[in-house]
Amino acid sequence: MFGPGRYVPDPTEGITKVEDLPAPQLRFYSRDCKQTPGPRCGHGAPRHTGGQRTLHDLGDLYTDRPVHLVVAFSSHYCDTCQRHFNIDLSDLAPPGGHYTNRVIDLAVRVVVEDGLPYRPASWHLWRDHRVFVPFATIQNWVEAGGKKGAGPYPRHVLGVGT
C-alpha cells in the first residue's frame, strides 16, 4: 500500500518509441449542423457533406491515458456566395493543427512562464498531462508567438471559406 510521500515511478518512463505509449482514449464530439450562415452573405447554407478530424487533447489523469478528440464536422455550400466551407472549429484548434488550443496554450506557458527548455517541456507534458508533443513542435509554437512571427495563432478566423 502506498502512503503519502512514497515514490511511485511512471510506468511509461524509459519508453523510446511513440508506438509503445498507452493507447489513447477516444472522445467523440460533433459539430455537424444541418444549416449555417454563409461566410460572406450570411444566408442559410445547407449541409453539403461531412468529415472527421482527430485532435490530441490533454490526457485523462484518472485512467492515465492520452485523449484523442474525434470531431465530426459538417461542410456546407452557400448558393448565394457560391462557396464551399467547413463549420468553424477554430475555438477547438487552429486550422490544420493536430493539437487542441488547450495543449498549445499549456505547452507555450510551460516554456515561457516556467522557463523549461523544449525537450524537458515535452517530457513534462507527457508525465503530468498525458499528451505527447515533440519538442520541435513546442519550439515552433513558442517562436510563432514571439517577435519572429506575426503574433500568436488567430482564435477567430475571419473570412473562413474564402
Which residues does each PLM region occupy?
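Short, conserved DNA-binding cores of transcription-related domains
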Residues: M1-R83, I87-S90
